[in-house]
A protein has these predicted regions:
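Conserved ABC ATPase "signature" region
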Residues: 69, 117-135, 187
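Helical segment within the ABC ATPase nucleotide-binding domain
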Residues: 180-196
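Catalytic Walker B motif of ABC-type/P-loop ATPase nucleotide-binding domains
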Residues: 165-168
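Conserved ABC transporter NBD signature motif
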Residues: 61-69
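A short, proline-enriched helix->beta-strand linker immediately N-terminal to the Walker B motif
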Residues: 159-163
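Conserved ABC ATPase signature
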Residues: 140-144, 148
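Helix-to-loop junction immediately C-terminal to a conserved catalytic motif
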Residues: 53
Length: 248
């Protein structure tokens, strides 16, 4: 039985004027695994992420998510399709004036027809699932530690039961203890939701943190995929760019 593909990037090129940002990218991200897109700053990672989310259209080629060519969808269809994605950014991007529970409730109020009582119960379950205890439900982000804010952001990302969870630089700038906490959280979340189908994508330049938890790695340099392999193969790569990156 062939492996299910979550995302297929087929001959994707992106130009802004004469500037080539992505250059004939070809790779596939398997479903129900953790795949990290690594690269130096300016490699094109953020531009690639925007293509995966349908926020940018390629100059050439196509991006498909679970077999659906994003280039065939209009803006309303794309907006609906993005509900397949949950996101956690480098900074949790919480609403400062909303409590932890209200932050998690936001997408449920925006995109579902659940009753207030149902939303509240779902938010409680989500917060508990990421180890935020009840005494913190009504705290503002300013009253939470950095690690707890990450957890609230993850709970919000999971609110709409996404098929794909996308983490953008989740460990950048964190101390080793918090980095381990975030990595454990990513793995625990992937394992917890694996049965119903969850694909994890990490965008990062933190090679040490991400190799510990990934199944596959795509290494991007100046808009080109230099290496796409399992983590084990990536560590043993003879490519000088890969070795330079690993040994930074």
């Amino acid at each position: 039985m062939s492996e299910e593909i979550a995302i297929a990037v087929e001959d994707v090129t992106k130009k802004f004027g004469e500037l080539v940002i992505l250059n004939h990218l070809n790779f596939k991200i398997p479903a129900n695994k953790i795949t990290t897109i690594l690269g130096f700053s300016g490699a094109g990672k953020s531009t690639l992420m925007k293509h995966i989310l349908g926020l940018l259209k390629p100059t050439h080629g196509k991006v498909s998510v679970f077999g659906k060519d994003l280039g065939t969808l209009d803006e309303m269809e794309l907006r609906e399709f993005r509900r397949n994605f949950g996101m956690l950014f480098q900074y949790a991007a919480l609403f400062d004036s909303k409590t932890a529970l209200e932050n998690v409730a936001f997408p449920l109020r925006e995109f579902t027809k659940l009753k207030d009582s149902e939303i509240r119960e779902k938010c409680k379950d989500l917060l508990l699932s990421v180890n935020i205890q009840e005494e913190s439900f009504n705290k503002l982000p300013s009253e939470l530690s950095g690690g707890m804010r990450k957890r609230v952001g993850l709970a919000r990302g999971l609110a709409l039961s996404p098929k794909i969870m996308l983490y953008d630089e989740p460990t950048t700038g964190l101390d080793p203890i918090t980095t381990k906490m975030v990595n454990d959280l990513i793995v625990d979340t992937q394992n917890k939701y694996a049965e119903r189908g969850m694909t994890t994508i990490i965008i990062s330049h933190d090679v040490r943190a991400t190799l510990e938890i990934s199944d596959f790695v795509a290494f991007l340099d100046r808009g080109t995929i230099v290496e796409y392999s399992t983590v084990e193969e990536f560590r043993l790569s003879k490519n000088p760019l890969v070795q330079e990156f690993i040994n930074l």
